[in-house]
C-alpha cells in the first residue's frame, strides 16, 4: 500500500474545435507515437465525413455511438482455492467511457482498406446505429458476465 495519498487525476482539456472532453479522449486514443496533430486531423476529417453522410451533428453521433458501446458489466479473473473464476463486476463510469472509446478506435483500425478517417467515421456511424464490431464486443462482454453470474458472490 502506498504511504502517500492518492495521485489526483489530471483534468482533460476540451478539444479546440468542438469544446468537448470526450472528443479529446477520442483524439488521444487515435494518436500513435505522440503525433497529436495527425490524430486531430483524422478525427476532425472523420467527423466531417459523418456530417456529410448522416446530415446530423457529428458530436451527437459520436456520443450516441459511445453510449451504445460502453459496457455495464465485465468479468475479472479471481483465484479461489486453486481455480480461476471469471467474476462479473460492474464497470466504473470512468472505465466505461475509456473502454468504449478504446473499442471504437480498435475496431475502426481493424476495418479493411480505406483511410483511417473513413474507417473511424464508418465505425462511429455503425455504433450509433447499434451495429459494428465495437457494439458486438460490448454484447460479448455482457454475455460473458451473464454466463458467469453464478460466481458473482466472489466479488470483492
UniProtKB/Swiss-Prot annotation:
The keyword Magnesium does not apply. GO terms for cellular component: small ribosomal subunit. Transmembrane segments: none annotated. Keywords: Ribonucleoprotein, Ribosomal protein, RNA-binding, rRNA-binding, tRNA-binding. GO terms for molecular function: rRNA binding; structural constituent of ribosome; tRNA binding. One of its GO terms (biological process) is translation. The keyword Cell wall biogenesis/degradation does not apply. One of the primary rRNA binding proteins, it binds directly to 16S rRNA where it nucleates assembly of the head domain of the 30S subunit. Is located at the subunit interface close to the decoding center, probably blocks exit of the E-site tRNA. Part of the 30S ribosomal subunit. Contacts proteins S9 and S11. Belongs to the universal ribosomal protein uS7 family. NCBIfam families: rpsG_bact. This is Small ribosomal subunit protein uS7. It comes from Moorella thermoacetica (strain ATCC 39073 / JCM 9320).
Amino acid at each position: 500500500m502506498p504511504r502517500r495519498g492518492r495521485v489526483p487525476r489530471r483534468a482533460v482539456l476540451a478539444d479546440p474545435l468542438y469544446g468537448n472532453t470526450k472528443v479529446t479522449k477520442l483524439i488521444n486514443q487515435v494518436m500513435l507515437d505522440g503525433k497529436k496533430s495527425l490524430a486531430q486531423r483524422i478525427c476532425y476529417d472523420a467527423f466531417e465525413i459523418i456530417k456529410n453522410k448522416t446530415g446530423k451533428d457529428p458530436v451527437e453521433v459520436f456520443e450516441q455511438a459511445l453510449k451504445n458501446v460502453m459496457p455495464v458489466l465485465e468479468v475479472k479473473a479471481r483465484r479461489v482455492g486453486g481455480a480461476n473464476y471469471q467474476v462479473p463486476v460492474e464497470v466504473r463510469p470512468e472505465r466505461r467511457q475509456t473502454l468504449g472509446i478504446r473499442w471504437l478506435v480498435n475496431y475502426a483500425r481493424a476495418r479493411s482498406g480505406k483511410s483511417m478517417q473513413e474507417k473511424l467515421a464508418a465505425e462511429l456511424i455503425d455504433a450509433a446505429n447499434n451495429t459494428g464490431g465495437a457494439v458486438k464486443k460490448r454484447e460479448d462482454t455482457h454475455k460473458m458476465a451473464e454466463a458467469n453470474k453464478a460466481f458473482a458472490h466472489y466479488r470483492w
